[in-house]
Amino acid sequence: MQDLSAVKAFHALCQHKSLTAAAKALEQPKSTLSRRLAQLEEDLGQSLLMRQGNRLTLTKAGEVFAVYSEQLLELANKSQEALQELNNQVTGELTLVVHPNLIRGWLSQVLDEFMQQHSTLKIRLLSQFQHSDEVFEPDLIIWIEHAAPMGYRKERLGYWRYAAYASPKYLAHRDKPTHPRELIHHPWIDFIACRRAELELHHPEFGSYSLPALESRLQSDNLAMQADAIAKGRGIGLLPTWFANGFETAHPGSLIPCVNGWQSQPTEINCFYPLGRHPLRLRLFIDALRQARPDEWQ
């Protein structure tokens, strides 16, 4: 059985192709990495790396052992996690991909509380993801609508419903619209996520109305910018009712709902996690998400 620290040193050298970069990544002296690599090569009776200019390249033996080093390290991590779960210890790292419009306000609070509860856990949070990226496999994806990526299970967290909002400043000089058909007479702030050839709005008493695509000087896919533009009196625009209520709580007197009772079709908020059994840290975080769902998402 190979020394795990030596295998980690070799793996880092494979990844970074440089003794200096690998030492920096592992936060170890270069002399330590060199010594561990030399010991590993002596134990295996094979040269694993060779220098070409300023870069390190794998020998034939190194290419073979690199495959097994990945497996050794993965197995070591899994065994460590299994032992820690015996004591309900949450360690390691969670890699999350989260839609930018879900981070502010809601997820940031969930993450903060979760990390305070589990002081040794590391979080890597990204707001960009493409299905075509086959190498990158996050532990959890939280997204607005979206089909489940290959190899992931979908769980619906809730729904957003969009409604039209204006600011008191804007309505001080204009009549407040009472029906969606009147929106065509107002400057429109277009939220790209809701832009269609036409947008179906629904009312519990008056049925449906198809709002045509409206010309807009400002188009944005960022909720914070959308809300700011509306609050500044630039026109009328759509916001998720949950987000608008939170914005109004934080900035009283900023937003007023227009055409009361008219809302868009529900938009799904989903999380996606890999098939199979999950480590304790992911299971607990998914539970935390379920418990933190706002009532307005139901």
From Swiss-Prot:
<dbReference type="InterPro" id="IPR036388">
    <property type="entry name" value="WH-like_DNA-bd_sf"/>
</dbReference>
<keyword id="KW-0804">Transcription</keyword>
<feature type="DNA-binding region" description="H-T-H motif">
    <location>
        <begin position="19"/>
        <end position="38"/>
    </location>
</feature>
<keyword id="KW-0805">Transcription regulation</keyword>
<keyword id="KW-0010">Activator</keyword>
<dbReference type="Pfam" id="PF03466">
    <property type="entry name" value="LysR_substrate"/>
</dbReference>
<keyword id="KW-0238">DNA-binding</keyword>
<dbReference type="GO" id="GO:0006351">
    <property type="term" value="P:DNA-templated transcription"/>
</dbReference>
<feature type="domain" description="HTH lysR-type">
    <location>
        <begin position="1"/>
        <end position="59"/>
    </location>
</feature>
<dbReference type="Pfam" id="PF00126">
    <property type="entry name" value="HTH_1"/>
</dbReference>
<keyword id="KW-0843">Virulence</keyword>
<dbReference type="InterPro" id="IPR000847">
    <property type="entry name" value="Tscrpt_reg_HTH_LysR"/>
</dbReference>
<protein>
    <recommendedName>
        <fullName>Iron-regulated virulence regulatory protein IrgB</fullName>
    </recommendedName>
</protein>
<comment type="function">
    <text>Transcription activation of the irgA gene. In the presence of sufficient iron, transcription of both irgA and irgB is negatively regulated by a fur-like protein. In low iron conditions, negative regulation of transcription is removed, and production of irgB leads to positive transcriptional activation of irgA.</text>
</comment>
<dbReference type="InterPro" id="IPR005119">
    <property type="entry name" value="LysR_subst-bd"/>
</dbReference>
<dbReference type="GO" id="GO:0003700">
    <property type="term" value="F:DNA-binding transcription factor activity"/>
</dbReference>
<dbReference type="GO" id="GO:0043565">
    <property type="term" value="F:sequence-specific DNA binding"/>
</dbReference>
<comment type="similarity">
    <text>Belongs to the LysR transcriptional regulatory family.</text>
</comment>
<dbReference type="InterPro" id="IPR036390">
    <property type="entry name" value="WH_DNA-bd_sf"/>
</dbReference>
